[in-house]
Amino acid sequence: MLDKSKKERKRNEIEPLINERIKYSQIRLIDTSGSQLGIYSSSEALTIALNAGLDLVLISEKSNPPVCRIIDYGKYKFAQEKKAKEAKKKQHNVTIKEVKMRYKIDVHDYNVRINQAFRFLQGGDKVKANVIFRGREIQHTKLAIELLNKMAQDLSHISEIQQPPAKDGKNMIMILSPKKI
């Protein structure tokens, strides 16, 4: 079976065609400074690139004729990888942090939960406030809603309600997200 491995196929999909791999008869050629040299046959363009000691790289195959550029492929590949790393570094994954409590919570414990939620929101994460019921406590959903609304009010300067208090099985949950500045 002559099937290529997944890794090889993926590598070939990502890497642009260079030098002899370019099979088009006519191509639009761009030099190292970015100016257009005109339309050449693939073999002429390859000769020009090799005489300059550089590579012929297919930039866009969707245009008619396809666009190729004379560049040092090693430097080009390094620059592309560096751009991808920078883009990955700048993106921030938002996670949901959970703060659990009971509807009968003491003042000090409540303040600890508020401080936890405050730190999570400052870090750019969403907060899932979870009021847990046990046994017959499920009858006191109004008290849990009041507690969650109080929490939302106490954190209103840094957060906004993404999901209002709602019953979720034996729990009452509310999701807060950081305010967009």
From Swiss-Prot:
<protein>
    <recommendedName>
        <fullName>Translation initiation factor IF-3, chloroplastic</fullName>
    </recommendedName>
</protein>
<dbReference type="GO" id="GO:0005829">
    <property type="term" value="C:cytosol"/>
</dbReference>
<comment type="similarity">
    <text>Belongs to the IF-3 family.</text>
</comment>
<dbReference type="InterPro" id="IPR019814">
    <property type="entry name" value="Translation_initiation_fac_3_N"/>
</dbReference>
<dbReference type="GO" id="GO:0032790">
    <property type="term" value="P:ribosome disassembly"/>
</dbReference>
<dbReference type="Pfam" id="PF00707">
    <property type="entry name" value="IF3_C"/>
</dbReference>
<dbReference type="GO" id="GO:0043022">
    <property type="term" value="F:ribosome binding"/>
</dbReference>
<dbReference type="Pfam" id="PF05198">
    <property type="entry name" value="IF3_N"/>
</dbReference>
<dbReference type="GO" id="GO:0009507">
    <property type="term" value="C:chloroplast"/>
</dbReference>
<comment type="subunit">
    <text>Monomer.</text>
</comment>
<dbReference type="InterPro" id="IPR036787">
    <property type="entry name" value="T_IF-3_N_sf"/>
</dbReference>
<keyword id="KW-0396">Initiation factor</keyword>
<comment type="function">
    <text>IF-3 binds to the 30S ribosomal subunit and shifts the equilibrium between 70S ribosomes and their 50S and 30S subunits in favor of the free subunits, thus enhancing the availability of 30S subunits on which protein synthesis initiation begins.</text>
</comment>
<keyword id="KW-0934">Plastid</keyword>
<dbReference type="GO" id="GO:0003743">
    <property type="term" value="F:translation initiation factor activity"/>
</dbReference>
<dbReference type="InterPro" id="IPR019815">
    <property type="entry name" value="Translation_initiation_fac_3_C"/>
</dbReference>
<dbReference type="InterPro" id="IPR036788">
    <property type="entry name" value="T_IF-3_C_sf"/>
</dbReference>
<dbReference type="InterPro" id="IPR001288">
    <property type="entry name" value="Translation_initiation_fac_3"/>
</dbReference>
<keyword id="KW-0648">Protein biosynthesis</keyword>
<keyword id="KW-0150">Chloroplast</keyword>
<dbReference type="InterPro" id="IPR019813">
    <property type="entry name" value="Translation_initiation_fac3_CS"/>
</dbReference>
<dbReference type="GO" id="GO:0016020">
    <property type="term" value="C:membrane"/>
</dbReference>
